């Protein structure tokens, strides 16, 4: 007997709403079962790394907001740390606490969108509506400190752009008091829901070895049972002073990755509480005049201060020759920046390591043998944003 099985090649995306951006997938299918899933990337490529080479170190910061535009402040954090490493400048403690505070708010901002949209992809509408209500509050905090809801451009090499407005810490404190009950409500809808578990448990399994081999990081790696978190293993700013746990999964399936993200939000709340309690007084920018512009009061009195301000924003500052790699534990995984300076006011090379790039490459092996509907679930738990993948 001859086997006359014929596979179907299906094009999914790039306009499909469930692909979370401009993902184009070429699926080779045997009926409803997926044999291969080949991602086609590059549809959102804007040449970010090359553009940064033609900008000063200060002008480069807004490009990082536009990579993973769901968690912008964490990307800025990595670039600021890399520039500070080359400059060997000291960041005031208040600025470090503010950075950590907003990095954790950003983590909640990211995970609420991921869990809400994941539920929507599977067919549950309510979690998205409830979580978007909470995201709106965090976006208002963004707006208070930076004037922008999304592309904040707030972190700076040497600190942050401006101090916290009066009353903001109290507002954030109120938010983290009322947020955990909302998370409990979401968990009561999803955790033991029969349909939710049928769609997530044992779907898209990545073993510990596979997760390591494919270069996974963040919730993708921790969901497979590996407790690797840069905030613990290689702490930056004041993370070494924070008391929090690293949630991990057991099976490495979609359900574990969902649950790790849910638990991470509770840990972020703990860190935010500690930041508010320990927040010191003081400056929010380094006192090095080469990096920090003069105050408005000085500019009204001194012509030299006006010239200094103008030159700082047009020509920037020179960074000593050298190279460095700095990474942060972004909500999606390890986001890294490799900087190479030749001693001028612009980076000679800026290489960006995006966690989503490695995660998307793992889609093929995680999808094999699953149904077409399961591919949508797996894409949702990868938590991909094409701003950072295509750059």
Curated annotation (Swiss-Prot):
* GO cellular component terms listed in the entry, alphabetical order: plasma membrane
As its record notes, the protein acts as a catalyst of:
a quinone + NADH + 5 H(+)(in) = a quinol + NAD(+) + 4 H(+)(out)
**Function per UniProt:** NDH-1 shuttles electrons from NADH, via FMN and iron-sulfur (Fe-S) centers, to quinones in the respiratory chain. The immediate electron acceptor for the enzyme in this species is believed to be ubiquinone. Couples the redox reaction to proton translocation (for every two electrons transferred, four hydrogen ions are translocated across the cytoplasmic membrane), and thus conserves the redox energy in a proton gradient.
Q: Endoplasmic reticulum: is it a keyword of this entry? A: no
Family per similarity comment: Belongs to the complex I 49 kDa subunit family.
Q: Which spans of this chain does the record mark as coiled coil? A: none
Q: Which UniProt keywords apply?
A: Cell inner membrane, Cell membrane, Membrane, NAD, Quinone, Translocase, Transport, Ubiquinone
Quaternary structure note:
NDH-1 is composed of 14 different subunits. Subunits NuoB, C, D, E, F, and G constitute the peripheral sector of the complex.
Quote the EC number.
7.1.1.-
GO molecular function list: NAD binding; NADH:ubiquinone reductase (non-electrogenic) activity; quinone binding
What this protein is called in its record is NADH-quinone oxidoreductase subunit D
Concerning Pfam families, the annotation shows: Complex1_49kDa
The top EC class is translocase
* Membrane keyword on record: yes
Membrane topology label? Peripheral membrane protein
The uppermost taxa in this organism's lineage are: Bacteria, Pseudomonadati, Pseudomonadota, Alphaproteobacteria, Rickettsiales
The record's subcellular location field reads: Cell inner membrane
């Amino acid at each position: 007997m001859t086997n006359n099985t014929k596979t179907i090649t299906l094009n999914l995306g790039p306009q499909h709403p469930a692909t979370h951006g401009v993902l184009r997938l070429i699926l080779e299918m045997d009926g409803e079962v997926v044999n291969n899933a080949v991602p086609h990337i590059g549809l959102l490529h804007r040449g970010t790394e090359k553009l940064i080479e033609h900008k000063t170190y200060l002008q480069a910061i807004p490009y990082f907001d536009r990579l993973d535009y769901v968690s912008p402040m964490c990307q800025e954090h990595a670039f600021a740390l890399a520039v500070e490493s080359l400059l060997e400048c000291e960041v005031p403690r208040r600025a470090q606490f503010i950075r950590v505070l907003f990095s954790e708010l950003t983590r909640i901002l990211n995970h609420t969108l991921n869990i809400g949209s994941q539920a929507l992809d599977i067919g549950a509408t309510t979690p998205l509506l409830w979580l978007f209500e909470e995201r709106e509050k965090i976006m208002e905090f963004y707006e208070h400190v930076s004037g922008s809801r999304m592309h904040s451009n707030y972190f700076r090499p040497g600190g942050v752009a401006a101090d916290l407005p009066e009353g903001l810490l109290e507002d954030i404190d109120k938010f983290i008091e009322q947020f955990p009950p909302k998370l409990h409500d979401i968990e009561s809808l999803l955790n033991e829901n029969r349909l939710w578990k049928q769609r997530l448990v044992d779907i898209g399994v990545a073993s510990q070895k596979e997760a390591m081999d494919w270069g996974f990081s963040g919730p993708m790696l921790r969901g497979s049972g590996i407790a690797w978190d840069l905030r613990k293993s290689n702490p930056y700013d004041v993370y070494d002073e924070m008391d929090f746990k690293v949630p991990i999964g057991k099976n490495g399936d979609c359900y574990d990755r969902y649950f790790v993200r849910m638990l991470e939000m509770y840990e972020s709340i703990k860190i935010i509480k500690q930041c508010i309690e320990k927040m010191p007084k003081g400056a929010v920018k380094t006192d090095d005049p080469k990096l920090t512009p003069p105050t408005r009061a000085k500019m009204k009195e001194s012509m030299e201060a006006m010239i200094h301000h103008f030159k700082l924003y047009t020509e920037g500052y020179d960074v000593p020759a050298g190279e460095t790699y700095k990474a942060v534990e972004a909500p999606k995984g390890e986001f890294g920046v490799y900087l190479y300076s030749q001693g001028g006011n612009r980076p000679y090379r800026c290489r960006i390591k995006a966690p989503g790039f490695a995660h998307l490459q793992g889609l093929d092996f995680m999808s094999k043998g699953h149904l077409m509907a399961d591919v949508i679930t797996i894409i949702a738990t990868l938590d991909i944003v094409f701003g950072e993948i295509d750059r």
